[in-house]
């Protein structure tokens, strides 16, 4: 009984002491990074959404670009065209231009995988350039969302479209799985 109590005490002591030493080591090795500026935070999120959708656009087999999990859904390429075309609601307003038409680009306008990939990349590059050009002050400007006709900050519109891109990323991850493939973000890191 005494040996069990001593063993328990030793384990308890180690459990309480070791995490403290690990935390002290972490505190010494890592300095706190400053928070990004508001426009930098938007840019980082925008670029992350773009990286994920671009990786999917580049990775998905071209012979499956019109794949639909069910007949009622958009094809893989149509999902990408819809999501990335919507980015221009932000970009056009940020640059003082007219927003794109309500309808999605037609698949026959983007006949090849390379055409779709180029559109995805350009959409995110144009948005990133607009965010950089606007900076913190410009991203705080008030605009009217063409869809809801509600006034909002330009940064809020950008975040709304980042969220929209995330929704379509999630849908496309399902397309991958139904097609028997593994999405790039779900693969083991090399």
Task: Say what each PLM segment does.
Residues 1-5:
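Positively charged n-region of N-terminal signal peptides that target proteins for export
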Residues 43-47, 54, 64-105, 142-190:
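Short, contiguous alpha-helical
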Residues 7-19:
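Bacterial N-terminal signal peptides
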Residues 44-48, 52, 118-126:
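A non-catalytic, amphipathic alpha-helix used as a structural packing/dimerization or gating element
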Residues 27-40:
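N-terminal low-complexity, Pro/Thr/Ser-rich intrinsically disordered segments
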Residues 100-123:
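Helix-adjacent hinge/juxtasegments
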Residues 85-89, 129, 133-136:
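Glycine-rich, acidic and aromatic/proline-enriched surface loops and short helix-turn segments
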């Amino acid at each position: 009984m005494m040996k069990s109590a001593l063993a328990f005490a030793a384990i308890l002591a180690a459990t309480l002491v070791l995490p403290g030493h690990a935390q002290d080591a972490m505190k010494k090795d890592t300095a706190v990074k400053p928070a990004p500026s508001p426009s930098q935070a938007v840019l980082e999120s925008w670029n992350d959404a773009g990286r994920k959708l671009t990786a999917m656009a580049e990775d998905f087999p071209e012979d499956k670009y019109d794949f639909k999990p069910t007949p009622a859904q958009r094809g893989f390429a149509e999902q990408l065209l819809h999501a990335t075309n919507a980015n221009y609601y932000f970009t056009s307003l940020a640059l003082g231009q007219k927003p794109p038409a309500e309808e999605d680009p037609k698949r026959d306008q983007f006949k090849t995988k390379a055409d779709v990939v180029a559109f995805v990349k350009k959409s995110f590059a144009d948005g990133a350039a607009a965010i950089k050009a606007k900076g913190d002050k410009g991203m705080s400007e008030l605009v009217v969302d063409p869809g809801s006709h509600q006034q909002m900050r330009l940064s809020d519109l950008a975040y709304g479209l980042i969220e929209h891109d995330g929704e379509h990323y999630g849908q496309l991850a399902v397309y991958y799985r139904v097609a028997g493939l593994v999405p790039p973000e779900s693969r083991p890191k090399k």
